[in-house]
């Protein structure tokens, strides 16, 4: 009985693992970007910068990307990889100067 259960569990895990694709360059929270630096919105320097450019963020713990540029999924594999801070960000209200709602990613 135990051996049948072990075989069933092993087969089930194998099917689940095969059916769940994982793409390293997938960005589910926004646009994939490379930022020169990242900081939380409540960091004094970041907060001052956001105030100067008129960006209001309600979540003070939100990760903010500074001086960001888009990364294309095609470009990641062909040499334009991000050597600074690769992140997925919800929005970039001031072009690439500030990106809001960022999540770190591995590329």
Curated annotation (Swiss-Prot):
Domain of life: Eukaryota
Tissues expressing the protein: Only weekly expressed in hyphae cultured in liquid medium.
InterPro entries for this protein: Hydrophobin (IPR001338), Hydrophobin_CS (IPR019778)
CDD domains (alphabetical): hydrophobin_I
Coiled coil: none
Keyword S-adenosyl-L-methionine: no
Family, per entry: Belongs to the fungal hydrophobin family.
Function: Aerial growth, conidiation, and dispersal of filamentous fungi in the environment rely upon a capability of their secreting small amphipathic proteins called hydrophobins (HPBs) with low sequence identity. Class I can self-assemble into an outermost layer of rodlet bundles on aerial cell surfaces, conferring cellular hydrophobicity that supports fungal growth, development and dispersal; whereas Class II form highly ordered films at water-air interfaces through intermolecular interactions but contribute nothing to the rodlet structure.
Protein name according to UniProt: Class I hydrophobin hgfI
Native source species: Grifola frondosa (Maitake)
């Amino acid at each position: 009985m135990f051996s049948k259960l072990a075989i069933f569990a092993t087969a089930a895990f194998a099917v689940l693992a095969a059916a769940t694709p994982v793409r390293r360059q997938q960005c589910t929270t926004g646009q994939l970007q490379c930022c020169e630096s990242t900081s939380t919105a409540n960091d004094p320097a970041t907060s001052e910068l956001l105030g100067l450019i008129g960006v209001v963020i309600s979540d003070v713990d939100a990760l903010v990307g500074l001086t960001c540029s888009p990364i294309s999924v095609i470009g990641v594999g062909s040499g334009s990889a991000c050597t600074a801070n690769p992140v997925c960000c919800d929005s970039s209200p001031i072009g690439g100067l500030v990106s809001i709602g960022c999540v770190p990613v591995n590329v």
